[in-house]
Amino acid sequence: MQKERSPEQYQNAIHNALQDSQRVIKLIDGLLNLAKADYEPEQIKREEIRLDELLLDARELVLRAYPDFHVELVFEQEAEDDKVLTVIGNSYLLTTAFVNLIENNCKYSRNQTSFIQISFWEEWSIIRLSDDGVGMSDKDKEHLFQLFYRGENKDVASGYGIGMTLAQKILSLHKGEISVFSHPGEGTTYVVKLPHI
């Protein structure tokens, strides 16, 4: 038999149910995107993409989902040719990868901020995504791209251990590279290299 509850208790129950359903949706979306990242490269629709525009789109998606987050985008050097900012790839997948990286920066930083720097060198477009957060141990760095791995700082932010694996697979699918530089208490920097046209 159900007991009587106050309107406030019903509101809390509905709020909790909505949060649970949003978490399940995010988990399912992550798993579906992971499956897409496992496609053969020939199966992926590709086009020329301006990285600066893609990063602005990713920034907008993050800020829409998390209004308290801050994302700063800086160009380290002026591009004399648009080609150094243009890659061949799948816009949806690359946006997904960068949204995951930006969200991680913001979730684990002290002030919910991600600093993004764009530069280029030889055949590479280079994107550095940094935070001033809790950082990570060598053990966490070693397992960072392992599916479902949650590091020592898992209590700081919610997640499922899918985002970093997904980002790495997507970047690899685009002949890119990702590396992580971090020390406990000193923040984290992800360095992404993608071949430009």
Predicted regions and their residues:
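Short helix-loop "hinge" at the ATP-lid/N-box region of the Bergerat-fold HATPase_c
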Residues: 105-106
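A conserved beta-strand-to-alpha-helix junction within the catalytic ATP-binding
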Residues: 45-63
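Conserved glycine-rich
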Residues: 175-177
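Conserved micro-motifs of the catalytic ATP-binding
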Residues: 5, 9, 39-44, 82-89
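Short alpha-helical segment of the dimerization/phosphotransfer core of two-component systems
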Residues: 19-24
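Short beta-strand/loop element within the Bergerat-fold HATPase_c
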Residues: 113-123
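Short conserved segment of the HATPase_c
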Residues: 136-148
